[in-house]
Amino acid sequence: MHVIAKKKKFRALNPVMASKNTLTRAIILTGLLAGTLDITAATIQFYLVTGKGPEVILRYIAGALFGAEVVNNQPVMPIVGLVMHYCIAMTFTAFYYWVYPRMAYLGKKWWVNGIVYGLLVWIVMNVLLVPLTRIGHRPFHLNNVLIGAGILVICIGIPIAYISHRFYSRRMV
């Protein structure tokens, strides 16, 4: 118990250390929330369209790195896909938290920024990153674009923008 008291005292005397720990925790929790919302929405949407479960989506995600032939023959690949999914969500979350204090307009209308960020995430994923993976280029279908972008706006953009806005608003007071 004495060691815990010293540790708390050290953090109180070292605001840089405390703020880095708090920021890291905020990024991790926000990334977990956004990633969970996103994979849940994608799974529900996929099930409603195909009748298939989340394993197919998670294998698809892993297939971006390993290729479909490897992914379909390995039972561990849905777990790999889930880990990859959360790594991507954490990356987009950390980037937003990094950009937020550097761009003054992000603090003004968090909900507009959330919509814009969700659309930006869709563009980065579907126009830049996915075509570079083993999945390759996919055909354009407006309905799929609208649904996918909508999911990313609601599940990634808005939650990240809202939570990071609250995080930084509390620190600037």
Please describe what each predicted stretch is.
Residues 1-20:
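Short, Lys/Arg-rich, polar N-terminal cytosolic tail immediately upstream
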Residues 47, 51-78:
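Extracytosolic (periplasmic/ER-lumenal) interhelical loops and adjacent juxtamembrane/interface segments
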